Amino acid sequence: MGEKQDPDKAYGKPAKYDPSFRGPIRNRSCTDIICCVLFFVFILGYIAVGLVAWVYGDPQQVLYPRNSSGAYCGIGENKDKPYLLYFNIFSCVLTTNIIAVAQNGLDCPTPQVCVSSCPAVSWTVATNQLSQTVGQVFYAANRSFCLPGVPGDMPVHQSLSQELCPSFLLPSSPALGRCFPWPNSTVPEVPEISNTSISQGISGLLDSLNARDISVKIFEDFAQSWYWILAALGVALVLSLLFVLLLRLVAGPLVFVLIIGVLGVLAYGIYHCWNEYRLLRDKGASISQLGFTTNLSAYSSVQETWLAALILLAVLEGILLLMLIFLRQRIRIAIALLEEASRAVGQMMSTLFYPLVTFVLLLVCIAYWAMTALYLATSGQPQYVLWAPNVSLAGCEKVMMNTSCDPMNQPVNSTCPGLMCVFQGYLSTGLVQRSLFNLQIYGVLGLFWTINWVLALGQCVLAGAFASFYWAFHKPRDIPTFPLSSAFIRTLRYHTGSLAFGALILTLVQIARAILEYIDHKLRGAQNPVARCIMCCFKCCLWCLEKFIKFLNRNAYIMIAIYGKNFCVSAKNAFMLLMRNIVRVVVLDKVTDLLLFFGKLLVVGGVGVLSFFFFTGRIQGLGKDFESPQLNYYWLPIMTSIMGAYVIASGFFSVFGMCVDTLFLCFLEDLERNDGSLDRPYYMSKALLKILGKKNEVPSGDKKRKK
């Protein structure tokens, strides 16, 4: 019969002693060159896509509304006229969706003109004004709402018949750069227009967006409270820094307090479930009486629900107690590594601020993609066509509508009333426009790949810095002078390709998840339960795969930073090393997660509570210089402070988490490479040596001196 395979051999042989190894390898060569070349070629293509988008794109159509002639409001010749006025906005309301009108103004079959301000009062052309001139009725009364170029001596009735001037005005507010009537405004006597039309067509838009009022109030609140928000973020920064640095003193007691707290919460849950189960059992409330129902809250009134919860919590409590009893040695090792990580961060304080570099690089990646996508979406040559408000009028039958025209040469003295050369849209017949979808896909792939590469760069750089701390035998004397900058230069010089390789693998999985989410969203209403179940299984599998790849990449980058091998070899060595110490991996991972979760909760919760009491004016007696500002939305600076505190805490604790993972891999390598002899001394701290019951041999001369 075959021999039983040794579990250690199944996951590779332990690392061998190397007398020349003294931490991160200095003499290394470039790794994954093919992937490096591919990444640089892709980046060059990404830059080319951006240049093409910049040449052909026109994002002004998104930022500024257009009038009937295609000219932008708010820039150029209309610089002092930032708002768009519809002569009869209710033709838009009655023919199309108001949101579509807000996005594509010329979908409305009515003339549109740029104005310096929206009308403030209701007005309509009186019967006795029809015989007067445009100059008398409009220009003299400061109603500059006619189309450009309308002469002042033109009769009003002619300007109205040709739709060169509006027949009525309503008090309006600017929203999305366009003048929208107030929902409760008084409507003049115009056919097919009533208060109901306004309420149905305008109220929804203004109530949901209320763009101008809300944006102004938000701006005012930020102007009043920005320095207090910065103060709150400063508090978050100090709390995060103190928490990381004090872990060397309180990591052990804090971890045990947290573990006891979790056990206590589970114990209370068991007690509560038992009380509920006993009461319902005495009442005879059983699931057999309830039967099957889709009302999930009804199941809380039957004894079986509480019995199942009781059993589940009891099992979890038992598992945690057994782990605490039998894995206490490994928990002590995890705590010692956390304390060592705190010392490492204290020795290299610059690592705490490296997330700022990552943040700036991520901001560049996202901003470049957003601008490229915007320019691509607005690429194409503008197209102008002939248009008239009423093609059934006499004289319009001879005009070929929707034919191309020049907006700089508007039709003059045409037999067709209101004939204009208007902007219709952008041509989609060019090479760029035909390839628009493919270019956008290229941009999305570039976004994912560059973001994952930037994150990988940060992990590898931090791993190189912290590895140099662990493998310094005499700390801090043997630590390099600039460990972070040295690791940064070393990573960029030799391992750009390896980082790109790992980032590409993760990107492909994330793209697959995004496609699956898109398909699920599109087919959600038409799927049967079986298809929904299959889709859910696929999504779950891809989610698990993404988590595993992130975990594997993270440890592969640590091995790359230390040994300078390519991505595949580093990933294999890291995986084998972790599998040979799987129990220690699980314990350290969970203890670290628990500690960092508590740290984030402490920082974010503390800043949130402090901000709430300050901005709601509940902290009294601090003097005039510390009075809370008067705000429209007091929750706005509170939420901003909380989100900022979370970002700051995540940045600090991501560095700490990377430090723990790096020191852990170095610790495992140290155990396999060395034995504590004079030739092969351990590099780990004295606390870890004491926990493991190991020690380094001391030269005979040092022993005599100690005596």
From Swiss-Prot:
The chain crosses the membrane at residues 33-53, 227-247, 250-270, 307-327, 356-376, 453-473, 499-519, 558-578, 595-615, 636-656. It is found in: Membrane; Apical cell membrane. GO terms for cellular component: apical plasma membrane; plasma membrane. Glycans are attached at N67, N142, N184, N195, N295, N390, N402, N413. Residues 54-226, 271-306, 377-452, 520-557, 616-635 are extracellular. The keyword Nucleotide-binding does not apply. InterPro entries: Choline_transptr-like. GO terms for biological process: acetylcholine biosynthetic process; acetylcholine secretion; choline transport; neuromast hair cell development; otolith formation; positive regulation of cell growth; thiamine pyrophosphate transmembrane transport. Residues 1-32, 248-249, 328-355, 474-498, 579-594, 657-707 are cytoplasmic. Keywords: Antiport, Cell membrane, Glycoprotein, Membrane, Transmembrane, Transmembrane helix, Transport. GO terms for molecular function: antiporter activity; choline transmembrane transporter activity; thiamine pyrophosphate transmembrane transporter activity. It catalyses: choline(out) + n H(+)(in) = choline(in) + n H(+)(out); thiamine diphosphate(out) = thiamine diphosphate(in). Choline transporter that plays a role in the choline-acetylcholine system and is required to the efferent innervation of hair cells in the olivocochlear bundle for the maintenance of physiological function of outer hair cells and the protection of hair cells from acoustic injury. Also described as a thiamine pyrophosphate transporter in colon, may mediate the absorption of microbiota-generated thiamine pyrophosphate and contribute to host thiamine (vitamin B1) homeostasis. PANTHER family: CHOLINE TRANSPORTER-LIKE (SLC FAMILY 44), CHOLINE TRANSPORTER-LIKE PROTEIN 4. Belongs to the CTL (choline transporter-like) family. This is Choline transporter-like protein 4. It comes from Sus scrofa (Pig).
